[in-house]
């Protein structure tokens, strides 16, 4: 249900958090004051919801040294919890395994960074709440300045959505190989070390890493 987000959008809370963590307001959720009043049955207070989140996607969601989670999604989830009178438990999942995690009962819902690449027939998807594109990033001193110059080269990605973006652009047939990395920090470390020639990332977080 997105009524909670629509109410928070009307309050300006989502825009505030987006600007705080991403430097820009990327939100696209409809604003609807008093949206929760439209529910036929009001939420039962005291419920615990297990949310599947990605780790290593700073500043969207990433674990801290003490084991807690920080970032845009945890802060927004806390605001939703306050609206509903619920508590949340975060479960780290791989974004490519959302349907399996939901089907097994390990999580009640998944809150991803920006996009979902699986079949929409196996899960119920909410409308997008962040405007996002994928970007191809190279080192500042790289000699690769055009897409065509990456022919036969190594591209680093972190998940299937980045691979889908690569395929949509037609570059998957041109590059030499595509390597998966655990998270964006590992992806950029590989780029800096020269282990890959470019990386594909969500545009909403590109400013954080560059």
Where are these regions (language model features)?
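Extracytoplasmic small-molecule ligand-binding "clamshell" domains
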Residues: 1, 16, 21, 42-121, ...
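A bilobed periplasmic-binding-protein/Venus flytrap-type ligand-binding module shared by bacterial periplasmic
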Residues: 1-4, 134-146, 209
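Ligand-binding clefts/hinges and TM-proximal coupling segments of bilobed small-molecule sensing domains
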Residues: 5-43, 161-183
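Conserved functional loop/turn residues at catalytic and ligand-binding sites
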Residues: 106, 154, 195
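Ligand-binding "clamshell"
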Residues: 117-132, 172-174, 209-210
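Short Pro/Gly-enriched coil loops immediately N-terminal to beta-strands
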Residues: 123-137, 149, 184
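Flexible hinge/capping segments at coil-to-helix
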Residues: 127, 138-155, 169-170
């Amino acid at each position: 249900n997105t009524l909670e987000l629509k109410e928070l959008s009307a309050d300006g809370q989502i825009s505030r958090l987006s600007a705080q963590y991403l430097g820009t307001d990327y939100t696209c959720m409809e604003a609807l004051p008093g949206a929760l009043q439209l529910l036929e049955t009001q939420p039962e207070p005291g419920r615990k919801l297990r949310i599947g989140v990605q780790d290593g996607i700073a500043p969207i969601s990433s674990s801290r040294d003490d084991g807690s989670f920080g970032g845009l999604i945890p802060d927004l989830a806390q605001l939703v919890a306050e609206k509903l009178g619920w508590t949340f438990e975060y479960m780290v999942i791989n974004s490519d395994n959302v349907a399996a995690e939901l089907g097994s009962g390990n999580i009640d819902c998944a809150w991803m960074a920006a996009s979902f690449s699986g079949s929409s027939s196996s899960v119920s998807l909410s409308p997008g709440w962040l405007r996002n594109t994928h970007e191809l990033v190279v080192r500042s001193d790289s000699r690769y300045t055009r897409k065509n110059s990456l022919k036969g080269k190594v591209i680093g990605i972190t998940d299937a959505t980045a691979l889908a973006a690569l395929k949509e652009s037609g570059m998957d047939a041109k590059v030499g190989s595509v390597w998966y990395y655990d998270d964006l920090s590992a992806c950029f470390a590989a780029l800096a070390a020269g282990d890959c020639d470019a990386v594909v990332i969500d545009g909403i977080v590109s400013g954080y890493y560059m």
